[in-house]
């Protein structure tokens, strides 16, 4: 999934969010609908960031013609949770440049944004994420990242030194 060239234009958008976005949800629905078919992936009875991240990421894993957008208070919890799913490459973006670079270099397939950001900024970030194409850059690095997913990592050991 990560090796596909091109942009996310025309793909299905799986959208997950938590309670922080609920008051302005209609505005986000409208903004996202300008870019394609939006499928809300939330548990309407429990607007919890982990539940939304799980629903969006499992949908993106099984639907190669899609990508995800996750929005919570800061975007950090969603990005941490999303990156635990095999084949998901989530990026928390706080600027248009972040969105462009995570697509151009890392071919991210899930965008994480902060509900606490200015709406106009988030709209610009979303547009950049969707319209920026992955062109095949840094392929060796992406292959290495993909190998991390299946690796059995040894536990980290802390080394304490006294002065």
What are these regions (language model features)?
Residues 2-8, 12-27, 96-163:
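C-terminal binding/interaction regions
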Residues 12-13, 64-68, 87-89:
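Short active-site oxyanion
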Residues 16, 40-42, 68-72:
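Short, conserved beta-strand edge motifs with alternating hydrophobic and charged residues
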Residues 24-36:
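A short, Lys/Arg-enriched amphipathic alpha-helix followed by its capping loop at the start of a domain
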Residues 36-49:
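A short beta-strand-loop structural module common to alpha/beta enzyme folds
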Residues 52-74:
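Short, structured active-site "lid" loops
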Residues 70-91:
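Compact, glycine-rich, soluble single-domain proteins
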